């Protein structure tokens, strides 16, 4: 069993992110093959990819859970440790991407050389911008018909607002793609036809056909680096050419600095074809050369356990007290519950006790594993900057902090979006009912965007998620992993309710005096809509002079929040409401927390009825790519679904239609689109915002909810 204290300068914690079909899993597979971890190249096409270890992922050819894998790469006589978090590219799994980005130091973004920057690429890029993650780009699939490297580079600039640094030029195109020109070394890297798996490539002089373009792009590269780096700027102004080493160092500085600033993201761009085994080794060199080590990342910020206002910083050092973030929970068929942890400071040692500072509970660290996609290596301890899987944590959930109990800290947690779609699930037998309970508990632990509640009136179990595919996968896992046989209802939209009018004053007295201890609570509240922003609820206390004792105020707040769970129009959760407690009264003997909670709840319901309540529905940003011939049909169809067309553009000879469409109108869209366009159009959609439902539609929804 190994105990590892890694040299942090030689560690890279990276994610590989992309749109669903850009070839991300294939790229990761090649990385694992060339770094010696995987002896047979796993192919997504035949369902053998190493990272995609859930059965469904192998069937669907997409990555659902981010598996963490450790591999090693030698560069210039040094051995580097690369921890790779594989992230899904399908929009329904954006939560997985969010939580991966939270614990990474750098990322490789993979683009499809044919399609360029696609909708999910933009989403993932924005997520990475939000977390300040430095990136390098890999333009993949250059062996495919219609692949164009430079168009993809332009799209990175135009669509993502980034400044691409072109590091390589392709040699040959489509089926004749042979290798790349390295613009730093000014050499050509050519993969020989003999090496079937692309292990060997030759470093040769740049072919005469490419020297002019190479000179031109080398000049552009140096100029772009000079704009962002003072050292190279000085050389540039003196008319001196930077050396290879100076250029490597400057590109590294620029890439890492752009992650920390809110200005334009500067990103080195590489190219190749992972499927045909060309261009992956230089990409690994680039991961080591340009992406940050845990030491390059600023000290992580958290807050004091007792006072959230007090900022606590922890440097990436083993000399600091322990601070680690649990970012993913997985059920391993052999080991049970595994918690993936990023250690930011201090040391995590097998068999010792740590504090879950969010819950204030002690946890014992069981075994610690360094994970390959579905194999593992046990280690005794792990230090700052590393990512591992831990056994034995019973109470820790995603986003919680493990710290030293003598100097506890709470690291910033992760925000998970509310579900936009839900289905009712009914177990077929009593035995299935019990299994369903276990399955739901496990899946909810693993996936915070999966939510469950019971419909009070029908007694049905309702599960919610981020899209049809997300729920399909969850139900599928219940069947496979937990052997639950259940009937699944049709997907339902997660509507919300809100108010449009301010109600200045509602008085409510809760009184129950029937001998013995009674109940008494009097409240006066106002409610108003919260304009703009994402706040779903605010509570303001304006009670003065002890009219309601301090200890009862939170009960009024709790009562109002409880009432918001079931709105007054159709029982959907309410959002966007500010409640102000103005005044009230109490009784020395009969008042209690419960009495004030009931009063708060009833006063809220009464006020909400008077505040012009309306129904909200999730609107999806839909992007359809279609041949010109079907453009009219596609637009007509979107309009018929209460959609609003927002933009139309041309992309690679096809037309792209962008619009906002209510989710309720998008069920079954994939089949309709296929039949309208003879299967030649494709679409993607992701949640955009909530919008008010038109009155005639709202009336139908309300009547249905009330069973009329």
Swiss-Prot record:
Binding site for GTP: 18-25, 86-90, 140-143
Annotated tr-type G domain residues: 9-295
Signal peptide (from-to): none
CDD domains per record: EF-G, EFG_III, EFG_mtEFG1_IV, EFG_mtEFG_C, EFG_mtEFG_II
Major localization class: cytoplasm
Origin: domain of life: Bacteria
Stretches assigned to coiled coil: none
Keyword Iron-sulfur: no
GO MF: GTP binding; GTPase activity; translation elongation factor activity
A GO CC term attached to the entry: cytoplasm
Key words of the record: Cytoplasm, Elongation factor, GTP-binding, Nucleotide-binding, Protein biosynthesis
Subcellular location: Cytoplasm
GO process terms (BP): ribosome disassembly
Entry-linked HAMAP family: EF_G_EF_2_B (MF_00054_B)
Family: Belongs to the TRAFAC class translation factor GTPase superfamily. Classic translation factor GTPase family. EF-G/EF-2 subfamily.
Protein purpose: Catalyzes the GTP-dependent ribosomal translocation step during translation elongation. During this step, the ribosome changes from the pre-translocational (PRE) to the post-translocational (POST) state as the newly formed A-site-bound peptidyl-tRNA and P-site-bound deacylated tRNA move to the P and E sites, respectively. Catalyzes the coordinated movement of the two tRNA molecules, the mRNA and conformational changes in the ribosome.
PANTHER family linked: RIBOSOME-RELEASING FACTOR 2, MITOCHONDRIAL, TRANSLATION ELONGATION FACTOR G-RELATED
Protein name per the record: Elongation factor G 1
Species of the source: Streptomyces coelicolor (strain ATCC BAA-471 / A3(2) / M145)
């Amino acid at each position: 069993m190994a105990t590892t204290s890694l040299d942090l300068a030689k560690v890279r914690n990276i994610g590989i992110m992309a749109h669903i079909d850009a070839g991300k899993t294939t790229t990761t597979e090649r990385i694992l093959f060339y770094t010696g971890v995987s002896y047979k190249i796993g192919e997504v096409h035949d369902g053998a990819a190493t990272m995609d270890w859930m059965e469904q992922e192998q069937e669907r050819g997409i990555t659902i859970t981010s598996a963490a894998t450790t591999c090693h790469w030698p560069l210039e006589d040094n051995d580097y440790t690369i921890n790779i978090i594989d992230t899904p590219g399908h929009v329904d799994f954006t939560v997985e991407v969010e939580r991966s980005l939270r614990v990474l130091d750098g990322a490789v973004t993979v683009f499809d050389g044919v399609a360029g920057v696609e909708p999910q690429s933009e989403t993932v890029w924005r997520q990475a911008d939000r977390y300040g993650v430095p990136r390098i780009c890999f333009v993949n699939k250059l062996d495919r018909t219609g692949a164009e490297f430079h168009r993809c580079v332009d799209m990175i600039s135009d669509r993502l607002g980034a400044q691409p640094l072109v590091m390589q030029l392709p040699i040959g195109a489509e089926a004749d793609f042979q290798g790349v020109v390295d613009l730093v070394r000014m050499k050509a890297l050519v993969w020989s036809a003999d090496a079937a798996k692309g292990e060997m490539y030759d470093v040769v002089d740049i072919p005469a056909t490419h020297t002019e373009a190479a000179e031109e792009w080398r000049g552009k590269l140096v100029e772009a680096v000079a704009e962002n780096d003072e050292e190279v700027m000085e050389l540039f102004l003196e008319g001196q050419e930077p050396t290879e080493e100076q250029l490597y160092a400057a590109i590294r500085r620029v890439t890492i600095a752009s992650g920390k600033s809110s200005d334009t993201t500067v990103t080195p761009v590489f190219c190749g074809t992972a499927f045909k085994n060309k261009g992956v080794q230089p990409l690994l060199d680039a991961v080591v050369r340009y992406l940050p080590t845990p030491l390059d990342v600023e000290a992580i910020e958290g807050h004091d356990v007792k006072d959230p206002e007090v900022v606590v910083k922890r440097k990436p050092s083993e000399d600091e007290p322990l601070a680690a973030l649990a970012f993913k929970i997985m059920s391993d068929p052999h080991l049970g519950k595994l918690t993936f942890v990023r250690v930011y400071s201090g040391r995590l040692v097998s068999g010792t006790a740590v504090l879950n500072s969010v819950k204030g509970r002690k946890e014992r660290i069981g075994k610690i594993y360094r994970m390959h996609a579905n194999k593992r290596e046990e280690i005794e301890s792990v230090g700052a900057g590393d990512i591992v899987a831990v056994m034995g944590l019973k109470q820790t959930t995603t986003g919680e902090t493990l710290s030293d109990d003598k100097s506890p800290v709470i690291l910033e947690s992760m925000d998970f979006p509310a579900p936009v779609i839900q289905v009712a699930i009914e177990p077929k037998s009593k035995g299935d009912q019990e299994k369903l309970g276990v399955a739901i508990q496990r899946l909810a632990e693993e996936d915070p965007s999966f939510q469950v509640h019971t419909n009070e009136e029908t007694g049905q179990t309702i599960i919610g998620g981020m899209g049809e595919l997300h729920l399909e996968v969850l139900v599928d896992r219940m069947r496979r992993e937990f052997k639950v046989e259940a009937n699944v209802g049709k997907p339902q939209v997660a509507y919300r309710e809100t108010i449009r009018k301010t109600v200045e004053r509602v008085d409510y007295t809760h009184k129950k005096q029937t001998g013995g201890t009674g109940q008494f609570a009097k409240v006066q509240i106002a409610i108003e809509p919260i304009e703009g922003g994402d706040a779903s609820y605010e509570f303001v206390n304006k009670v003065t002079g002890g009219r309601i004792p301090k200890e009862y105020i939170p009960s009024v707040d709790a009562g109002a929040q409880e009432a918001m769970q079931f709105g007054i129009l159709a029982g959907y959760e309410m959002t966007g409401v500010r409640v102000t407690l103005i005044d009230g009264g109490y009784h020395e003997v009969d008042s209690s927390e419960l009495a004030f909670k009931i009063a708060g709840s009833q006063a809220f319901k009464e006020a909400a009825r008077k505040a012009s309540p309306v129904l909200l529905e999730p609107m999806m940003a839909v992007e359809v790519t279609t041949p010109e011939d079907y453009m009219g049909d596609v637009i007509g169809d979107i309009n018929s679904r209460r959609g609003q067309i927002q933009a139309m553009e041309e992309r690679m000879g096809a037309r792209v239609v962008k619009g906002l469409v209510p989710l309720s109108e998008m069920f079954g869209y994939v089949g309709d689109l296929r039949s309208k366009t003879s299967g030649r159009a494709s679409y993607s959609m992701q949640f955009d915002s909530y919008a008010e439902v038109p009155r005639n539609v709202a009336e139908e929804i309300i009547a249905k909810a009330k069973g009329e």
